[in-house]
């Protein structure tokens, strides 16, 4: 167990400021008290007035509109914001949408009806230059509302993209945020105030797409949206997950317990299930048939209630599929000794559905502590073309995996975020990529797993008040503002005081030191036996997170153990 203390280890006077400064936040006070003054006016986005005027003109002319829904949570929320907004300002608008079959992104010309006058592409489409030109030639206009990096501005589409807007300083805002800005621009032109009611969707989309929660504008939208959950589907999702979230609508709880349900439907749901979810996002008031298990008769329930039930089932289905595929992929990794490479490159043809590639790649990156590339055949792109997903390992040496791959010059494309992207490559070039990366990083320990800890505290000096204080800051945590880790040293515990708990299977290790409980999940029988093999007193070091276990109104301070090492064992001291 290795760790590195970052910051000044101030756990007495202002621990929150210590944590925030460790995350690169220069003004903790401003961060904690973020307000509307951090919002950047939409007019700083290039082409936004042009896009707003274009949509208004098409609505006035009663033209046919087509929205392509992108295949992730940010895509569904950004499309929902735009479609719901259009229905608000123009209830009779002739608007249609299309959901992707799988995890595709952007538009496909043959799926857009010939009589469409305006195509709107939220959360995608900036770099689809050929498609823009083809649609233009048949007389169709295109509005792109996007946030992804792109090399240039399209000549044949109206592109509103914060990455392509030099005067718009917030590059972290995602598709849902950009959709909201678009609606704001239309509001001002029409003297309306409809965009504000969709802030809950703005928040969900930004959190799901791992927007940098250090950015003040982005954080403001996240916070405001979670304070104002009005959307019926979102309200029921938070209600369903109340046990896990303890009723706390925080950024971290949303990322862990709400967005994975929506994502599961996008990844493993049938076309009918995805369509029902989209109708729920679009505020449908319909009733749908539902038959309870063990009953012969069906009843009609609200679409939002039924959709939440379906999402729960799909999340469980996704877990079963991912677990089974994960075993097969890990077997391949071991059989072919792939961990010897600097980057984990795995050919997964026939093992895993395309829609789950990114999810599994992310899990493998966390487990193997190195960047991961999962590849499969892609006959649609060419006979000898492989495509798939990459995921970086944020805590490792390589901070921008996408750039490293692009710099090899061997890929057809690598598109997406620095540590989460899709790619295409010629089969023979993938072998060369592996050689290039192995050579480039031959003297670097890519898997170096040194945990950055915010505080290092001897066990004898750790106070329950400090643990409860840190737990009270949980609403601040999010992407790039990670929950703090604490290194607790020289903790002495009698072996017989260590418990192994669980209802069906014992998987939790627990012990108490002073007023503080220590708990480690996913601890099987083998782990417990190894930990308790010695007699006497264990002297251990622990890396963990501060938690508070609340029961019947009483809060018990806990350390959720991330890593544990036994430093030494000593004999029991005589008590007389």
Swiss-Prot record:
EC number per UniProt: 3.1.-.-
Intrachain disulfide bonds: none
Keyword Electron transport recorded: no
Annotated GO biological process: DNA recombination; DNA repair
An example molecular function term from Gene Ontology annotations: single-stranded DNA 5'-3' DNA exonuclease activity
Keyword Metal-binding: no
Protein name, as recorded: Putative SPbeta prophage-derived single-strand DNA-specific exonuclease YorK
Higher taxonomy: Bacteria, Bacillati, Bacillota, Bacilli, Bacillales
Gene for this chain: yorK
């Amino acid at each position: 167990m290795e760790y590195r203390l970052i910051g000044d280890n101030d756990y007495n006077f202002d621990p929150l400021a210590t944590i925030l400064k460790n995350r690169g936040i220069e003004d903790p006070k401003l961060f904690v008290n973020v307000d509307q003054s951090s919002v950047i006016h939409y007019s700083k986005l290039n082409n936004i007035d042009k896009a707003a005027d274009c949509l208004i003109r098409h609505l006035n002319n009663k033209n046919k509109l087509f929205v392509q829904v992108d295949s992730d949570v940010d895509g569904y929320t950004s499309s929902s914001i735009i479609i719901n907004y259009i229905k608000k300002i123009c209830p009779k608008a002739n608007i249609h949408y299309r959901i992707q079959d799988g995890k595709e992104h952007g538009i496909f010309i043959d799926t857009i009806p010939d009589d469409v006058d305006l195509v709107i592409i939220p959360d995608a489409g900036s770099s689809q230059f050929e498609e823009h030109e083809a649609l233009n030639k048949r007389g169709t206009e295109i509005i792109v509302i996007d946030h992804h990096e792109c090399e240039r501005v399209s000549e044949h589409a109206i592109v509103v993209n914060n990455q392509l807007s030099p005067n718009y300083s917030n590059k972290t805002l995602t598709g849902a945020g950009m959709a909201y800005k678009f609606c704001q621009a239309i509001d001002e032109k029409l003297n309306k105030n409809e965009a504000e009611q969709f802030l809950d969707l703005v928040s969900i989309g930004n959190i799901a797409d791992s927007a940098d929660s250090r950015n003040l504008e982005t954080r403001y939208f996240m916070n405001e949206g979670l304070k104002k959950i009005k959307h019926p589907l979102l309200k029921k999702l938070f209600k369903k997950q109340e046990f896990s979230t303890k009723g706390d609508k925080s950024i971290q709880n949303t990322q862990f317990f709400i967005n994975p349900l929506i994502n599961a439907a996008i990844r493993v749901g049938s076309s009918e299930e995805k369509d029902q979810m989209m109708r729920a996002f679009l505020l449908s008031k319909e009733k749908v048939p539902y038959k309870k298990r063990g009953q012969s008769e069906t009843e009609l329930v609200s679409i939002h209630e039924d959709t939440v039930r379906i999402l729960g089932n799909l999340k469980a289905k996704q877990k079963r599929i991912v677990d089974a595929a994960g075993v097969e992929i890990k077997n391949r990794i071991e059989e072919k000794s792939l961990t010897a490479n600097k980057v984990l490159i795995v050919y997964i043809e026939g093992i895993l559905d395309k829609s789950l590639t990114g999810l599994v790649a992310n899990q493998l990156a966390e487990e193997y502590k190195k960047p991961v590339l999962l590849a499969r055949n892609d006959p649609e792109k060419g006979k000898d073309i492989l495509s798939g997903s990459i995921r970086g390992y944020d805590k490792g040496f390589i901070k921008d995996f996408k750039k490293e791959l692009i710099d090899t010059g061997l890929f057809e494309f690598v598109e997406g975020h620095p540590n989460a992207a899709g790619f295409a490559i010629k089969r023979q070039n993938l072998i060369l990529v592996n050689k290039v990366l192995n050579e480039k990083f031959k003297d670097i320990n890519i898997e170096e797993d040194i945990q950055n800890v915010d505080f290092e505290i001897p066990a004898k000096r750790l106070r329950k008040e400090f643990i409860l204080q840190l737990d009270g800051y949980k609403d601040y945590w999010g992407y790039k503002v990670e929950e703090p880790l604490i290194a607790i040293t020289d903790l002495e515990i009698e072996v017989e005081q260590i418990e192994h708990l669980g209802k069906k299977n014992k998987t939790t290790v627990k012990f108490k030191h002073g007023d503080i409980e220590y708990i480690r999940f996913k601890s099987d029988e083998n782990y417990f036996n190894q930990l308790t093999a010695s007699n006497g007193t264990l002297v251990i070091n622990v890396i963990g997170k501060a938690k508070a276990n609340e029961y019947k109104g009483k809060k018990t301070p806990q350390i959720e153990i991330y890593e544990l090492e036994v430093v030494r064992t000593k004999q029991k001291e005589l008590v007389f």
